[in-house]
Amino acid sequence: MKANELREKSVEELNTELLGLLREQFNLRMQAASGQLQQTHMVKQVRHNIARVKTLLTQKAGA
């Protein structure tokens, strides 16, 4: 997800997005641990998206 798309979302929407990303990260880690993960690059992408959302939440909390 692009940072511009995330900036347009409200705090509630960002929290929902964060929960979804954390669930996805958990599922990817479980797949990696069991050897079923085909697209290993997804772990890094999800981690970066989580960081983007958390950064925006921090910025919106300060503003």
UniProtKB/Swiss-Prot annotation:
Write down the species.
Answer: Pectobacterium atrosepticum (strain SCRI 1043 / ATCC BAA-672)
Q: What is this protein called?
A: Large ribosomal subunit protein uL29
GO BP field: translation
Q: Which UniProt keywords apply?
A: Ribonucleoprotein, Ribosomal protein
Of which family is this protein a member? Belongs to the universal ribosomal protein uL29 family.
PROSITE patterns per the record? Answer: RIBOSOMAL_L29
Gene3D superfamilies xrefs = 1.10.287.310
Q: Which NCBIfam families match?
A: L29
- Record's GO cellular component terms: cytosolic large ribosomal subunit
Q: Name one GO molecular function term.
A: structural constituent of ribosome
